[in-house]
Amino acid sequence: MKHLFLSALILLGLTSCQIAGLTSGYSHLSDAQKERVITLEENIDDIHDFSKVYKVSLNQVKQYIETHDKVLLYNYTPFCHSTYCVSPAALVPQCKDKGINVLVISNIYDDIFKQKHTTFPMLMIDTKQFPTKWRAKYLDLFYSPLTGHTDKELNYANFHYFEKGKYVKSYKNSNDI
């Protein structure tokens, strides 16, 4: 009887757990937050309302890279506190001073609205374009066609640099850019 009660208690605890990071996390958003997530229909350059999160396709990002001389894609994880993760609000002006356009592309919705961004758009991978709900898989499916490398081959770098439409290099540390 004691083991049955303990097993039931553990099972109840596990069913109430929410594991962040395996999927996009869209289901974790409140209804008000979901209303602020917009599927972008036009070009990335046409975004002027920075209070929303814009789901972007691989083709929209390719088009942006092809039409700007220097582009840095930041594979952004909002809740990351590693030394390799930086605030987009700090990264964007640092790169603009070097003449580099930055696209901050979140790879998950968890904590995406905690960061204030008033000078750049917050983008999110439109996961519906890929045949998987698993974050690690859709990240590879999104970035591999752009860089020509898998996430593992790039040693899981979060900063991908392009010049004149061509992939140049990926960086783990934003200070190396």
Q: What label would you give each PLM region?
A:
Residues 155-170:
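A short, hydrophobic beta-strand/beta-hairpin element that forms part of a small beta-sheet core
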Residues 13-16:
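C-terminal motif of bacterial Sec signal peptides marking the signal peptidase cleavage site
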Residues 84-124:
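Structural microenvironment flanking redox-active thiols in thiol-disulfide oxidoreductases
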Residues 117-153:
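Short, internal strand/loop/helix patches
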Residues 1-4:
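Positively charged n-region of N-terminal signal peptides that target proteins for export
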Residues 18-21:
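Bacterial signal peptide processing site
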